[in-house]
Regions:
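Polar, glycine-rich mid-to-C-terminal structural blocks
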Residues: 286, 298, 305, 309-377
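Bacterial Sec-dependent N-terminal signal peptides
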Residues: 1-27
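Structural motif
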Residues: 119-121
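Extended, small/polar residue-biased N-terminal targeting/export presequences
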Residues: 25, 42-103, 149-181, 507-517, ...
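Cleft-lining beta-strand/loop regions that shape enzyme active-site pockets
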Residues: 18-27, 31-48, 71, 101-104, ...
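Residue-level recognition of conserved beta-strand edge/terminus positions
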Residues: 125-126, 157, 343, 390
Length: 533
């Protein structure tokens, strides 16, 4: 009898599978017939490739908000951003009056090797003029980038030279760093800001930790604000810095993939100091994995505002045309069992995209009291602290969004690009003397002898803003706006030194950063926050 029952069950399963395959086959036949009909009988010529891509996007739109189709070009751009490098000439530039102005060259990169200098203007690429052509960023990048080993001729205008200077530049791999800033925020307090979780992030983080350790770091602030995520494995490897071996960092569960645990493997030295993690409403995915893991295991204090709430795992599926479907295959869960994914309605991308705007309207970004979690979403950390799933990581210390930080005239000057235009001109005119007077970022920031933004500079920016028709009647208030002066200095320092110079100056105007500093400097309060309530 038992054998008959087994045969019945197996037969039912096989029939179910066969029916499912038949359904897919019939759907494919219907789609192919429609496509062939359009191609052969439609009144005008149709682009079959474009129609196919549109159909794929429409199918995925009916699923979750994060299953997406990427064109071959978008796949290349994604790989460059997360792969840790791209192939090109190695310059950092800005467009000024439709002309490419070199801000600086990558140290040891192709352009530096042939003698291209900061302040040079690239007028021609090969036999094509790029100056004055109103090319967008994508077109400029397309012309400058190319396979490693390929050679491009660049026609450069240099101050003091009457004719174009020509350089043969052999393209090479150019690193794209995921660490935006790394420095000692105070004696014994290190600070690392991550913009994304790329393949190279664990290696970059290890180097940054080593340098900070040499400078006497005992405690660390990890800034994940506005970090939209990246590779799950990179987040797991970063957890290795803070946790002993074999600790659960995250687990995933899906219909076809089952359950999979991700554990620490003691890849890096175990950091034992106090840890504070900064997050905000734009911190998502891999950022939430790291923050959620450290919170669940009571290894760090989370400071800021509730994170984005992306708890879905996508797997890349390559398409024959070089495109890719990023298909959601599972949910991820923090060690306490929290699913961080915020609610969504299948097919309603609009409401999902407006979630952050609705948080602002409902007052969540200004007050933690406006956030309500159901008891069914309650979980517990290792020490027994209550945490909630179902919609992002809620910080241990909530810091409201300060909407008064940037005044109306300050926003107007930024929106019109007036500040950036002025900095480009000022940098070009004073670059040499600035480097001589302030050879290091430390010299630039020195309280007594460091760089000071003058009234003349503020006046120059206001004049530029008026030329740009900046919509504000209060531009003169910028003379007494200290945050505005800090941003002017930060933009200039970013052009003079490494990229992290901007964060190093502007962090002191950030309520989230200052709250993190207050916690990490107060050992008693830090420990109390991690205790069971």
């Amino acid at each position: 009898m038992k054998q008959i029952d087994k045969l019945i069950i197996i037969t039912c399963l096989l029939l179910f599978a066969a029916n499912a395959k038949a359904d897919i086959y019939n759907s494919m036949k219907t789609f192919n017939s429609a496509l062939l009909c359009l191609d052969s009988r439609y009144v005008d010529t149709v682009n079959v490739d474009a129609l196919t891509e549109t159909a794929i996007k429409a199918m995925l739109k009916e699923l979750d908000p994060h299953s997406t189709y990427l064109s071959p070009k978008e796949v290349q751009q994604m790989n460059e951003g997360l792969g840790g490098s791209f192939e090109g000439i190695g310059v950092r530039y800005q467009m000024e009056n439709d002309t490419l102005l070199v801000i600086n060259t990558v140290s040891g990169g192709p352009s530096e090797k042939v003698g291209i200098l900061a302040g040079d203007r690239i007028i021609m690429v090969g036999d094509s003029t790029i100056a004055g052509q109103k090319y967008d960023t994508n077109e400029i990048q397309r012309r400058l980038r190319g396979p490693k080993g390929s050679v491009v001729d660049l026609g450069v205008m240099r101050q003091g030279e009457r004719e174009l200077l020509w350089f043969k530049v052999e393209r090479d791999k150019i690193p794209v760093y995921s660490i935006d800033a790394s420095y000692m925020a105070a004696p014994e307090i290190g600070y690392i800001r991550l913009s994304r979780f790329a393949q190279t992030t664990p290696e970059e983080f290890d180097k940054a930790m080593g340098k900070l350790d040499e400078q006497g770091m005992k405690h660390l602030i990890v800034d994940l604000q506005d970090n939209g995520g990246g590779y799950l494995n990179s987040a797991v490897e970063l957890a290795d810095f803070f946790l002993p071996s074999s600790e659960l960092v995250v687990y995933t569960e899906g219909r076809s993939d089952g359950k999979r645990n991700y554990l620490t493997r003691h890849l890096f030295d175990h950091f034992k100091g106090r840890v504070v993690v900064l997050i905000n409403e734009q911190s998502a995915s891999a950022s939430e994995i790291l923050a959620g893991c450290l919170q669940d295991l009571d290894r760090g204090v989370i400071v800021g505002r509730r994170s984005f709430g992306k708890g879905l795992v996508q797997s890349p599926v390559r398409m024959p045309n070089g495109g890719m479907i990023r298909l959601t295959i599972s949910h991820y869960y923090t060690p306490s069992g929290r699913c961080i994914q915020k609610p969504y309605t299948k097919g309603d991308q609009k409401s999902y995209n407006e979630d952050l705007l609705n948080r602002f309207k409902q007052g969540e970004l200004q007050s933690a009291d406006s956030i309500d979690f159901a008891d069914s979403l309650k979980c517990f950390t290792r020490n027994g602290r209550v945490v909630y799933g179902g919609g992002g990581i809620m910080p241990d210390i909530f810091v409201p969004l300060d909407t008064t930080t940037y005044t109306k005239p300050h926003r107007a000057v930024n929106a019109k690009g007036s500040l950036n235009k002025y900095i480009v001109q000022y940098f070009k005119a004073h670059q040499q003397e600035l480097h001589q007077q302030y050879p290091t970022i430390e010299a630039f920031l020195d309280e007594k002898s460091g760089f000071k933004v003058t009234d003349e500079m503020v006046g120059g920016i206001i004049e530029q803003a008026r030329k740009d028709s900046a919509q504000s009647n209060e531009l003169d208030s910028l003379y007494t706006n200290e945050i505005f002066r800090s941003q002017v200095a930060a933009y200039l320092a970013n052009d003079l030194y490494e990229q992290g110079a901007y964060s190093r100056i502007m962090n002191h105007t950030s309520d989230v950063f200052n709250a993190g500093m207050a916690i990490i400097n107060d050992e008693h309060r830090y420990k109390e926050l991690l205790k069971s309530k």
